[in-house]
From Swiss-Prot:
Belongs to the universal ribosomal protein uS19 family. This is Small ribosomal subunit protein uS19. It comes from Acidothermus cellulolyticus (strain ATCC 43068 / DSM 8971 / 11B). One of its GO terms (cellular component) is small ribosomal subunit. One of its GO terms (biological process) is ribosomal small subunit assembly. Keywords: Ribonucleoprotein, Ribosomal protein, RNA-binding, rRNA-binding. HAMAP family: Ribosomal_uS19 (MF_00531). One of its GO terms (molecular function) is rRNA binding.
Length: 93
């Protein structure tokens, strides 16, 4: 179930303060964050936010189409290496 509209979007305070500070200065430096749960708000458009995936920080450039989604959606946590192709020669027995 989605979040109630009367509550508004959830964004961690420390992340929002960093974005607003960069907007006030007019800079667009990469912002490192562990806050995968924060929702993307219009103030973040044009910024690059490095979202932690459990191992490293994945840079995510924020566009208008991403508004309303959470940061964690754009930094996958699992690495799929593909299924191993079955080799007929190795199955002979």
């Amino acid at each position: 179930m989605p979040r109630s509209l009367k509550k508004g979007p959830f964004v961690d305070d420390h992340l929002l303060k960093k974005v607003e500070a960069q907007n006030a200065r007019g800079t667009k430096n990469v912002i490192k964050t562990w806050s995968r749960r924060s929702m993307i708000v219009p103030e973040m458009i044009g910024h690059t936010i490095a979202v932690h995936d459990g191992r490293k920080h994945v840079p995510v450039f924020i566009t208008e189409a991403m508004i309303g989604h959470k940061l964690g959606e754009f930094a996958p946590t699992r690495t799929f290496r593909g299924h191993v192709k079955e080799d007929r020669r190795s199955r002979r027995g």
